[in-house]
Amino acid sequence: MPNITVNGIDHHYRLEGPADAPVLTLAHAQGFTLDSWAAQFDHFAGRYRVLAPDLRGHGGTAMAGAAYRIEDLAADFVALLDALGIERIHYAGASLGGMAAFALALDHADRLRSVSFVTTQGILPQASIDGQRAATDVMRRDGAEARVDAILERYLRKGYREDRPDSYAELRRQFLNVPVEGYAEAGAAIFAMDFDDRIGAIDLPVMVIAGEHDIATTPERMALYRDGIPGARMDIVPNAGHMPYVEEAGAFNAILAGFIDSQPTG
């Protein structure tokens, strides 16, 4: 998979599918990498051109080395599209990637055909900020190994580790390969964001996708975006937590495909 420098940062990305097909861009969660979208590449790359980068400080993409905002992640996407000669995209972002979706939808709507918000939110409750700061402090002191299993067990449905040990091990591998400071830089950007007061201004086809058993971003929390964004649709992936695109990829793919396939191709 290639690398390209945009906005002064070396970005790692994967791009597959027919050159003349509509582009579906996938953005991963904090602490993970573009590899978390493996099942979506398998499903969509036959008829869409599928693009997924590693976000700043994750996977093969360099750290920013300084504080940044969620809006800067959106600017990275726009610069990447420009560098690759891509005009407009369907965008699906999970958690951190979904937070960037708010900035894209509000500030760069002309680059989007549609946007799918996956297990994400536009402002983090203070209790969540406090919990993540504490977890980051532990990882800075003791390494990511000290928190990886607690974080995965919060994100994944109950019993996933036992039911899908290979998948669990792959997610664990991704998390441990993200530098702690890359995770922390993303966390600082998340803590500072506040998009919820502006969601009524989003004027795009929108799908909101929740996981039935997600305790990090509950379906009830996600419903605020269905209700607050004009024309937004919502679906819930059964038997999934915070990572439905991994936990129940078949059901997730069906929901996403049903939405983006219904959009105009022009």
Residue ranges and their predicted role:
Residues 232-266:
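Catalytic active-site module of serine/aspartate enzymes centered on a nucleophile-bearing elbow/loop
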Residues 202, 208-210:
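Short beta-strand/loop motif that positions the catalytic acidic residue
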Residues 212-217:
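Acidic catalytic loop of the alpha/beta-hydrolase fold
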